[in-house]
Amino acid sequence: VSRDVVRSEHIGRQLPLFVGIGVVALAASVCAVRAAEPAAARGKALFEARCASCHGAGLAGGEFGPPLSGPSFAEHWRGQPPEALASFISSRMPPSAAGTLPPADAAALQAYILHADQAADGALAEKASAPGSAPAQAAATPPPAPGPARVEIRDPGLAEAKAGRLAPLAKLSPVTDAMLRRPADGDWLMWRRTYQTLGFSPLRQIDKTNVKALGSAWSWSLPASQNEITPLVHDGVMFVQSGDAVQALGAAKGDLLWQYVRALPETGSEARSTRVKTMAIYGDRLYAAFVDGHVVALDVKTGKPAWDHALLADADATNRGRADGVSYHLDGGPIIARGKVILGVSLGTDTPKGGCFIVALDARDGSEVWRFHTIAQPGEPGGDSWNGAPANERYGAGVWTPGSYDPDLNLVYFGTGNTYDVANLLEPRGGKVGPNDALYTDSTLALDADTGKLAWRFQHVHRDVWDLDWVFEQSLVDLNIGGKPRKLVVTGGKIALFDALDRATGKYAFSRDMGLQNLVLGVDPKTGEKRLNPALEPEAGKPKFMCPSPLGARNWPATAIDPASGILYVPMVEFCTNYSYSPRSPEQTAAGGVDISFSGMLPRPGNDGKFSRLTAMDLKTGKVIWTRRQRAPLASAMLATAGGIVFTGDRDRYFRALDQATGKVLWETRLDAAPSSFPVTFSSGGEQYVAVTTG
């Protein structure tokens, strides 16, 4: 677990480094005892004097603190002992002087919170009375009134300073469908900037001649998470999601404008270990997915929730995004298409109830529009491709990368992962092994954005039992191939072999192999069918040497493509592994899990001590333009710009600008932590910035 820092660099006078510590939000607990009215009245006065400036009067949430009422807050503390609330407040609040609040004051604040809940909907009392909790007691007298909706600032200087700091919010314009189709040059409105997911910006103020003057503009500490963060920028406001928090920052200075902190159950540490790659912005709302399986729409100017939708209705919120004991993840994040919020779901190695899925929600109210399951079910097209395994023994096909979208075709494109427990594909059923391609694992899926109907699918590798997903970015690029214009979707799996498909029909066009794998020996030039290395077929108890390792020659750090030149920039690592197949009992196989194991990461044969490479390849011809190799593995996605630069970061904490034409290092800086994220570039106040999240 790390504490992420978002940093912004720009050309011009080197500004002093601004370091801000993210606000630690107050969270209270559900207690089963309701205090007497006098204590609640005293707690109300204390709250308004000492807490409301962050949490807002009336417990509704403020600019710097989460709400202390409502069902989400109640779920956060369901089943806690009666003394938990006062103990937490006394020991943890206020963040700037934790432990200084007298126990009597903490008890009074607890009483106020519980009484105020009674006046609302009793969510705290209802949750406190859940199984395993002590029963709530009836209050003897009505609770005090919750107070005004906002805290009034009476100091003229403070009010003026606050108004100036919040000024960027007033300039925010609603994001339209037209903006999403063609974003303003200075904005970064979605994961890889545009629907095409190219990771390319038309900004050129920072170019090869002046990038050496790039200097620090500001930095800002974020709540702890595992990074893979993409900041979004619109009209000079940056939106960042880290762990259980969403923050709006002034893009030019890094000032905190508002934050939303989602109250999550305390079980486990998933809020800090989750990897949500992006949010989405549309109209006057920001759409964020959280580890508890909820998608939330937030007002872009205030951070106030507009709606909150649970993707799995039977999810047990006390178990952090688990349904029927099965974990699920929203690691990709949403994309907007024709008023719908569309995202994929991954459910881990013990996939339940039809498997992973892609879902579309109505952006207006969060209601579900459609759902597409990525594991073909018995009786459906592709349902006979699982070696006769029943539906509840089909695993994988996770969707943990955001999709892309072609507005002209109204198709969204998603990649899927491999299966996990492979014995159900390899072992005979009824005396023989049946068809076992395992659809729709390792596939590109093209879905109608309005209905979720499958338009076409292409499986890149059949029956992947080596954990070599094809789940990554689906890049939409127009290329001239053999004198003919082609509208293609290009994607590469962990083996760093890239397939190009016609994005209207899914017809195979060509493949480009980066040369770091030994699984695929050849590709049919007409169909794209892969001829796999028979020496790597699983044999029980027999280790086999395979390249790449299960972490892949490439993984989640996304590629970039210059749409004008058709040059693809690919970050890769050079590792191999020994893998073993260990079949388990039929009962264990049916229950899910894994039966392929790996020895870890091993150097490639003949390795010279360099374990990472960045390659620029002409997609039209397959010609490698240049390759830059180094010892430290690359850590960030690629960011290419019209200034002739490609930005990249590595595990050795360096963030670099390279010449797109040659791979030469033009500028570099060493950060406080590895930039394991998706760099973006934007403009504000007439200046171009580059932002990257570290940690």
Task: Mark where each language-model region is.
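Electrostatic cytochrome c docking/interface patches
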Residues: 31-46, 97, 175
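Sequence/structural segment immediately N-terminal to covalent heme-attachment motifs in c-type
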Residues: 38-61, 105
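Gly/Gly-Pro-rich "capping" loops immediately C-terminal to redox-active cysteine motifs
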Residues: 44, 57-90, 94
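Flexible coil segments in periplasmic/lumen-exposed cytochrome c-class electron-transfer proteins
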Residues: 48, 96-195
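Repeat-blade elements of multi-bladed beta-propeller folds
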Residues: 188-192, 224-245, 270-295, 325-358, ...
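Extracytoplasmic beta-rich repeat domains
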Residues: 219-232, 259-280, 308-333, 373-402, ...
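Short loop/turn segments that connect beta-strands within beta-propeller blades
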Residues: 251-253, 300-302, 363-365, 449-451, ...
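Beta-propeller blade signature
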Residues: 298, 355-367, 432-433, 437-451, ...
